[in-house]
């Protein structure tokens, strides 16, 4: 038997009176996500932690070389990690984010001991609603930005890796509508887009940025120096 609230939602969508019902639905989805993020998504899928540890090991091993050679392996490992994270997000929220790609990871030297780090992420997103099924498909682009530097203690002479903030700016998340269910009101499509924006923003803030920070902080100063490379105006060091 179809639940009453689903029938009410469907009638509201068709009649154009569903704004408050969509808000309730969206808030429920976000509550489930935040609850999962607070627990840690790794508690829902132990593979996340395994992939993350393998990513750290892979990057550390590359730093054993005199020069960190450009390779797609790190990007592939990071894609696997993010894909697994979004699989858990799908289980919690019903929003499907797949075909994750990390084209490159760049370290743009700002001095001999510091660099801006850029990690672009692309993915396909599908938003569904009860009874209606898929309402909108989106193209997702996220540009994670942070910085890394090597600081030396004036008294002890010891050096340490310092990772900057990973700002969760709305401008860093771009969504493009690829397909929408015919006949739907614009308000319903806007609901889907805004829901994804809030969802991805929460994942970036509570899951992706902390893991990028932990990854960089796990590397020693010599490895970071190799990744930074020489400061140049027009050249980026890719990993």
Swiss-Prot record:
One of its GO terms (molecular function) is lipopolysaccharide binding. It is found in: Secreted. Its main location: secreted. Disulfide bonds join 166-209. It comes from the Eukaryota. InterPro entries: Bactericidal_perm-incr_a/b_dom, BPI_fold-antibacterial, Lipid-bd_serum_glycop_N. Gene3D superfamilies: Bactericidal permeability-increasing protein, domain 1 (3.15.10.10). Residues 1-20 form the signal peptide. Keywords: Disulfide bond, Secreted, Signal. Detected in salivary tissues: parotid, submandibular and sublingual glands. Belongs to the BPI/LBP/Plunc superfamily. Plunc family. This is Short palate, lung and nasal epithelium carcinoma-associated protein 2A. It comes from Bos taurus.
């Amino acid at each position: 038997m179809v639940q009453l609230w689903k029938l009410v939602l469907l009638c509201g969508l068709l009649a154009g009176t569903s704004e408050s019902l969509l808000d309730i639905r969206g808030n429920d989805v976000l509550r489930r996500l935040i609850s999962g993020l607070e627990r840690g998504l790794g508690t829902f899928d132990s593979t996340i932690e395994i992939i993350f540890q393998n990513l750290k090991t892979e990057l550390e091993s590359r730093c054993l070389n005199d020069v960190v050679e450009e390779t797609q392996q790190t990007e592939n490992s990071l894609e696997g990690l993010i894909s697994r994270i979004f699989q858990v997000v799908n289980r919690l929220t019903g929003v499907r984010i797949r075909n994750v790609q990390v084209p490159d990871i760049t370290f743009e030297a700002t001095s001999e001991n510091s660099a801006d780090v850029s990690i672009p992420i692309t993915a396909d997103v599908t938003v569904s609603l009860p009874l209606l099924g898929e309402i909108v498909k989106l193209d997702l682009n996220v540009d994670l930005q942070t910085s890394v530097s090597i600081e030396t203690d004036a008294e002890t002479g010891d050096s340490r890796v310092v990772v900057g903030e990973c700002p969760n700016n709305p401008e860093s998340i771009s969504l493009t509508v690829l397909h929408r269910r015919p006949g739907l009101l614009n308000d319903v499509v806007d609901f889907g887009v805004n829901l994804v924006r809030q969802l991805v923003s929460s994942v970036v803030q509570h899951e992706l940025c902390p893991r990028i920070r932990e990854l960089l902080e796990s590397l020693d100063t010599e490895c970071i120096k190799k990744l930074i490379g020489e400061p140049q105006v027009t050249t980026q060091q890719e990993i």
